[in-house]
Amino acid sequence: MTLRPVFIFDLDGTLVDSVYEHVLAWQEALDAEGIELSVWRIHRKIGMSGGLFTNQLLRETKVDITEDRVERLRHLHAKAYQRLSGKIRPLPGARELLQSLTNASIPWAIATSGRMETAAHNLAVLGVDV
């Protein structure tokens, strides 16, 4: 049996320079809900799944995070992120790396803890079909 290499890449902060747009979008969403949390605390949570993010948010702010509020926050984040996403670019060499792997018939995939409503733009910036 021959082992073949396979690559799985994270999207935000690995292939595209989008971390700060996520941070600013979450800050805007939290501000709209009256939840105070400093930017550096939000930055520490980027990459967490939605459930873990909201659990950490509850722990740090002592604010009740209901299902309705989670949905509002997600919607507000996505809306702010879409507005900020025009500045997002692939990180240097990311497109070329994916193309080189494709040309060499080496399978690769992209993973993200984000939702498609924000990830779709980043994938398009990379030239990846969804």
Positions of predicted regions on the chain:
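An amphipathic alpha-helix signature
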Residues: 23, 27, 50-55, 116, ...
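Active-site neighborhood of HAD-like aspartate-dependent phosphohydrolases
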Residues: 2-43
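Histidine/lysine/aspartate-rich catalytic loop segments that bind and position anionic ligands
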Residues: 113, 124-129
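A short, structured active-site edge motif that brings together acidic residues
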Residues: 41-46, 69-71, 128-130
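Short, acidic loop-to-helix structural element flanking the phosphoryl-transfer center
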Residues: 3, 83-110, 116-120
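A metal-dependent, Asp-based hydrolase signature
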Residues: 47-80, 92-95, 100-102
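Conserved H-loop
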Residues: 36, 64, 128-130
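Generic non-transmembrane alpha-helical segments
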Residues: 25-33, 73-83
